[in-house]
Regions:
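Active-site ligand-binding patch in enzyme domains
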Residues: 2-142, 151-154
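Short, intrinsically disordered, charge-balanced linker/junction segments flanking boundaries
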Residues: 156-158
Length: 158
């Protein structure tokens, strides 16, 4: 599997701060590049903390990119992936409610509240990058874009 890590940092190395508001580091040009990068992948992974803080939909909004994916026999939206240790995810999050995508949640807990909105892949122990890759490969994912915060990035770099 091809795995791409996507993140932005400040000049002094910060990914984010501890404020409740999202720290905007990227420029509009950066976001255009991120959207092109998203379009070239099968799946996108963001951690549960990102979902709770930012409530992203993780969609491709560019009509040309969506049409190109359709022409290649792909769904217009990327497969969405997240992981949670705490299980604190609401089925009303945009991750679950917006777009036409497969959705996978890797969790250390059973999450019956997500039945019908995502496939929950339970872990017997801790969630690892290797286990995520193995399960996603079984589901046909060949190119994974990881838009992680520090914890998720560390997991995939270890």
């Amino acid at each position: 599997m091809q795995i791409t890590l996507s993140f932005a940092t400040t000049a002094d190395g910060y990914l984010d701060d501890n404020s409740p508001r999202r720290l905007m580091i990227s420029t509009p040009e950066d976001w255009e590049a991120v959207l092109r990068l998203r379009a070239s992948h099968d799946a996108i992974l963001a951690g549960a903390e990102t979902l709770r803080r930012d409530d992203p939909a993780l969609l491709l909004r560019d009509a040309a990119a969506r049409e190109l994916r359709r022409a290649r026999g792909m769904r217009p939206d990327l497969t969405k992936v997240t992981l949670t240790h705490s299980g604190r995810l609401s089925p009303s999050m945009r991750f679950f409610t917006e777009g036409d995508a497969y959705r996978y949640v890797f969790s250390e807990k059973e999450l019956p509240e997500l039945k019908g909105v995502a496939e929950v892949i339970s872990s017997d122990g801790s969630i690892t990058a290797s286990a995520i890759v193995t399960e996603l490969e079984k589901r046909g994912v060949e190119r994974l874009l990881v838009e992680g915060g520090a914890s998720v990035l560390r997991m995939f770099l270890a």
